[in-house]
Amino acid sequence: MKLRYEIWLPHLKFTLQTMSLNYPLNPNEVTIRKYYNFIQNLPIFFPDEPMGNYMSTLLDEFPVAPYLNSRRSFMKWVHFLFNKINKKLNLRTVTFYESLEEYYQH
């Protein structure tokens, strides 16, 4: 039995947004590598195999590596990623600034 995305996806989004908002302004190579490995391994832990496979596809199509050089670019990548997931699930997409407003109202 798979866990419904309505249960786990908001928590994943909150976690990744929190990580991106606290990402270093000027990360060093060790930090970049650790974040890269974390993001690349996320699909393994998705409680819904089709969504995990979709996440793997997104990571192949839109790799995180070029966006790990600054906090702002990582934040924008996380936002972009969740809009892709929302489209796949026929959920509402939001602008970058709307996503920040929603985060801080959480």
Residue ranges of each PLM-predicted region?
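Aromatic-rich, lipid-facing transmembrane alpha helices and their immediate juxtamembrane interface loops
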Residues: 1-106
